[in-house]
Design a protein with these regions (language model features):
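A conserved regulatory-domain signal marking ACT and ACT-like small-molecule sensing domains
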Residues: 1-141
Length: 141
């Protein structure tokens, strides 16, 4: 598992920009951002380097932030590869709570998934999927 930053942001003009600025001012690079919203607040899920420092920077700026463990799976950046991964997880009775993807610009995509199930990492590895190690994405802080 790797660390993802989860941030609760009031659904008001400028608040997302303020959160991103707090991260940038701490010298932290964001790799991916996924937003979900309700009427009153949004949830930003951020894949970044130095997630522990980012969490503290956001808390210092007045945001509610926490680290969430997620899977990161490297798959070829070709049509059908994401569907193959999701079908495999379904066949293994793994529930996917949410996910997002980004292109790694090297012929691969990184699929970030919040899952529930037993020994998911081991099952993915045995099936030939490449899990992304934390030190491939961010500095271990």
């Amino acid at each position: 598992m790797i660390s993802q930053l989860t941030v609760f942001i009031e659904n008001k003009k400028g608040h997302l920009a303020n959160a991103c600025r707090a991260i940038a001012n701490a010298g932290i690079n964001m790799h991916a951002l996924f937003l979900a919203d309700t009427a009153d607040f949004g949830i930003a899920r951020i894949f970044c380097d130095r997630p522990n420092f980012a969490t503290q920077a956001l808390r210092d700026a007045g945001f509610r932030a926490k680290i969430t463990p997620v899977l990161a799976v490297r798959i070829p950046d070709h049509k059908g590869c994401l569907a193959d991964l999701l079908e495999f997880l379904d066949s293994e009775d793994v529930n996917i709570e949410y996910g997002y993807c980004y292109s790694a610009n090297n012929g691969y995509a990184i699929d970030v998934l919040k899952v529930s199930g037993d020994e998911v990492e081991e099952r993915l590895t045995l099936a030939g999927y490449q899990l992304v190690a934390p030190n491939e994405i961010y500095e271990l802080d």
